[in-house]
């Protein structure tokens, strides 16, 4: 949940999900550009989470485990039974004898069985039950009866939650020790060694992405959720309860998932599960619901890191940087990291921000404490009001529209009078890491990794309609508009602003920014290896490529001229011109 990489807004976001995970900067203080550059890209490591809260709480939680539902639930062992053999002899009217044989078996409770095994050595003193000889009397029916205590081998599948009942037990025996061993919890499913566990390594280790280990990804996100719940929530783990599972203490989460963590005050503060929670269907965290998503995430991490280092190198060399590529420098981990803001952005007639280049002298750096949160997307509204809640952080802090607008370091773009001369209200304001607002709406760049992790975590959460952070806000939230662009092409020119507004007026807004869920097993692939010629011509574009209408028209025009001139026998001259055109840099 805390890996924030890409500047793309996923147009395949879940239709039922009403929020976008973000990494929000707070408590920012200005630092020099030189100091900020040293901290960019996480220093010299792929992941760099510096957060005292996480440092302290991770050790308290320790290892987190969940059942492996592919394991066999069958248990095999011994139980005691009282077996009665009866023989009834009755004389008939013709003076014949009718003999009836009856066998009865009655279970013996666990404590009594344990005592009998030790006192009577049932394991070695094996006696097969047999019927006594009939005793027939001429005057009345007679009954002969024998009772035997026997160990019976059982092969059963028992409910992992129902083991508290004394009638449910199985014993096994060590060859060197006649004392019975409680074995009901020893099915493959219940054995702790077969559970899927995520170690107490600090933070999200890169190993969880190898081999497409979606269970470890979910466990890590649950672990991070527990950290925030235990520090900021009303309960140590929100909407969770304690129960005995496979005979050991466990926790049932709000979505039915079963987990085990180290005994600590976090666990002891939970209530016991009532019957309805016990009977609630379980969620299999180990189920692989997406194909090959782990390696894609790992590849994305590495490519993002390499791209970030290239941009950082250009900044250190005082070279100007295309404005949209600066978003790649935004930190993707919580904790203390730099934030970048551009103090001056000029309005251009170009439709895409890709053509805007920001000089290094126009960049400012701040050191901020990042905390994970989510943007509230509860519908569409033309204008945000000051009291509208637009962001809720993991510590339950609300960020209202007036709070966001009142933050430091908002810079208004510089108007070009040849483009915008009558309505300066349509100018954009730029903030940290590419956050932008125009009039009473704002854009917050989303990240591919964050939203992919959200999908993995919330794929079972949707059914319960409970948000990941489980906020304690029981009230209706005023519907607000949060505009998200596919390729962060939030151009500040007037024409593009009008086209965006027209788009939002239609009924296809949700189809634009969200996905359909018709195929839950659809592969979440990478964004491809598209090349983008910028500065050193080695930048890898992590975003979705979107061609504007003007670009398409330009290409078609070039193609038309190319065909026309080829017919006119001046092909080589035209080929040279086309090559020169495409070699132009930004």
Curated annotation (Swiss-Prot):
Glycans are attached at residues 27, 68, 274, 350, 383, 476, 501, 521. One of its GO terms (cellular component) is host cell membrane. Pfam families: Rhabdo_glycop_FD. Residues 15-544 are extracellular. It is a single-pass type I membrane protein. Keywords: Glycoprotein, Host membrane, Membrane, Signal, Transmembrane, Transmembrane helix. It is found in: Host membrane. The keyword Membrane applies. The chain crosses the membrane at residues 545-562. InterPro entries: Rhabdo_glycop_FD (IPR001903). Belongs to the ephemerovirus glycoprotein family. This is Non-structural glycoprotein GNS. It comes from Bovine ephemeral fever virus (strain BB7721).
């Amino acid at each position: 949940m805390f890996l924030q990489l890409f500047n793309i807004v996923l147009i395949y976001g879940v239709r039922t999900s009403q929020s976008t995970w973000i990494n929000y900067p707070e408590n920012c203080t200005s630092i020099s550009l030189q100091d900020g550059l040293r901290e960019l890209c996480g220093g010299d490591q792929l992941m760099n989470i510096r957060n005292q809260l996480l440092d302290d709480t991770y050790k308290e939680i320790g290892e987190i485990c969940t059942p492996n539902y592919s394991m066999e639930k069958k248990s095999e062992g011994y139980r005691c039974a009282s077996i009665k053999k009866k023989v009834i002899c009755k004389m008939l009217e013709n003076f014949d004898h009718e003999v009836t044989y009856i066998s009865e078996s009655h279970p013996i409770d666990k404590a009594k069985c344990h005592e009998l095994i030790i006192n009577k050595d049932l394991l070695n003193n094996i006696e097969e039950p047999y019927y006594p000889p009939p005793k027939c009397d001429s005057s009345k029916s007679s009954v002969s009866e024998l009772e035997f205590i026997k160990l019976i081998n059982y092969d059963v599948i028992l409910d992992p939650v129902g083991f508290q009942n004394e009638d449910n037990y199985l014993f096994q025996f060590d060859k060197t020790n006649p004392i019975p061993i409680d074995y009901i919890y020893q099915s493959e499913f219940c054995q702790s060694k077969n559970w899927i566990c995520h170690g107490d390594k600090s933070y999200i280790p890169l190993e969880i992405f190898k081999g497409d280990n979606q269970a470890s990804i979910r466990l890590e996100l649950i672990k991070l959720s527990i950290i925030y719940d235990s520090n900021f929530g009303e309960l140590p783990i929100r909407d969770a309860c304690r129960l005995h599972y496979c005979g050991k203490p466990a926790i049932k989460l709000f979505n039915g998932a079963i987990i085990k963590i180290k005994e600590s005050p976090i666990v002891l503060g939970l209530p016991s599960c009532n019957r309805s929670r016990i009977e609630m269907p379980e969620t299999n965290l180990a189920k692989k619901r997406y194909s090959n998503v782990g390696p894609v995430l790992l590849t994305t991490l590495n490519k993002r890191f390499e791209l970030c280092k290239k941009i950082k190198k250009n900044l250190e060399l005082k070279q100007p940087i295309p404005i949209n590529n600066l978003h790649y420098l935004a930190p993707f981990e919580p904790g203390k990291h730099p934030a970048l803001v551009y103090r001056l952005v000029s309005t251009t007639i170009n439709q895409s921000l890709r053509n805007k280049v920001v000089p290094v002298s126009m960049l400012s750096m701040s050191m901020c404490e990042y905390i994970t949160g989510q943007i509230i997307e509860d519908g569409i509204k033309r204008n945000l009001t000051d009291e509208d809640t637009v962001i809720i952080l993991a510590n339950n802090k609300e960020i209202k529209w007036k709070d966001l607008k009142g933050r430091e370091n908002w810079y208004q773009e510089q108007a070009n009078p040849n483009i915008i001369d009558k309505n300066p209200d349509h100018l954009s304001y730029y903030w940290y890491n590419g956050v932008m607002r125009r009039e009473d709406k704002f854009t917050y760049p989303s990240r591919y990794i964050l939203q992919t992790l959200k999908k993995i975590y919330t794929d079972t959460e949707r059914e319960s309609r409970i948000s990941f952070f489980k906020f304690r806000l029981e009230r209706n939230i005023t519907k607000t508009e949060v505009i998200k662009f596919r390729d962060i092409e939030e151009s500040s020119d007037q024409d593009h602003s009008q086209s965006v507004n027209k788009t939002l007026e239609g009924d296809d807004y949700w189809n634009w920014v969200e996905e359909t869920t018709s195929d839950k097993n659809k592969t979440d692939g990478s964004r491809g290896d598209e090349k983008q010629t910028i500065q050193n011509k080695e930048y890898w574009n992590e975003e979705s490529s979107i061609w504007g209408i003007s670009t398409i028209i330009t290409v078609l025009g070039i193609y038309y001229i190319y065909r026309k001139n080829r017919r006119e026998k001046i092909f080589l001259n035209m080929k040279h011109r086309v090559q020169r055109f495409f070699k132009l840099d930004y």
